[in-house]
Regions:
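Phenylalanine-focused residue identity feature
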Residues: 21, 134, 141, 147-149, ...
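Low-complexity, intrinsically disordered/propeptide-like segments
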Residues: 6, 11, 124, 137, ...
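Leucine-rich solenoid repeat modules
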Residues: 9, 152-219
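Concave beta-strand-loop units of leucine-rich repeat
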Residues: 78-84, 104-111, 130-139, 159-165, ...
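Leucine-rich repeat
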Residues: 37-42, 59-72, 89-99, 113-126, ...
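Hydrophobic beta-strand segments of well-ordered beta-sheets in folded domains
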Residues: 7, 46-48, 72-78, 99-103, ...
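Hydrophobic regular-secondary-structure patch
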Residues: 1-99, 105-108, 112-114
Length: 219
């Protein structure tokens, strides 16, 4: 039974890009046993890895319209590769998942978030651990909007992968609970960044009582 649960847990953590529903393949397995269904639903929705706009929209429909109670199980959300993500779908998804403790976004989903009202509202997802991957595209004015969101009021740990020059920009955010920032610098970017820039960024964060750690082990 334990092995069965571990296998199902692994299955539901991944989203098939060709599927029109995040956990489409899971339901046939769970339908075998009602007891198994009730035990695995919280596991199935604990961590959601969304890799397409369709997956986000389908999940939003499930959590907002079909089964709102499932939203209480969601503790982690990762959204990537959603260039054409509808802002309203993302907004409704974030407003429904009030118990999220960690979140991961790439550039595309971060830009989509800037087009919604979700980050500015008092209700909705408020993660404690936040991870951003800014290596897949460029951010311009969106960054100023992004770091000012009320959504980040509870963030204690921030993990960023991308251009070190963005570190100083992010230091201007509110970040009332933030204690540490770990910045993963791709080796391809290290040769173009001076140590002076990195030292200045560390000082900016240090002045706020926040620790910034550079990590250039990322490839």
């Amino acid at each position: 039974y334990d092995l069965h649960c571990r296998i199902l847990s692994h299955v539901v953590r991944s989203v098939d890009l060709t599927s029109d529903f995040p956990h489409q393949g899971l339901w046939r397995i769970l339908s075998v046993s009602r007891d198994m269904y009730h035990k695995m639903i919280p596991v199935a929705y604990r961590a959601l890895y969304l890799r397409s706009p369709v997956s986000v929209n389908r999940l939003r429909y499930t959590l907002v319209v079909q089964c709102p109670s499932y939203a209480t199980y969601v503790q982690h959300i990762s959204i990537c590769h959603c260039e054409d993500l509808a802002p309203l779908a993302l907004e409704q998804l974030l407003l429904s998942t009030t118990r999220v403790s960690s979140m991961h976004l790439d550039v595309a989903s971060a830009k989509a978030m800037c087009m919604t009202q979700a980050g500015r509202l008092s209700k909705g997802a408020k993660p404690v651990i936040l991870s951003w991957d800014f290596t897949t595209g460029a951010l311009s004015f969106e960054l100023d909007l992004l770091f000012s969101f009320d959504m980040w009021q509870r963030v204690e740990s921030l993990y960023v992968r991308g251009d070190p020059r963005l570190a100083q920009v992010l230091s201007h955010g509110l970040w009332p609970k933030l204690r540490q920032v770990r910045w993963f610098v791709p080796l391809t970017m290290m040769k173009d960044i001076s140590t002076v820039v990195m030292a200045q960024a560390m000082q900016k964060w240090s002045n706020r009582g926040i620790s910034l750690v550079w990590d250039n082990s990322a490839t």
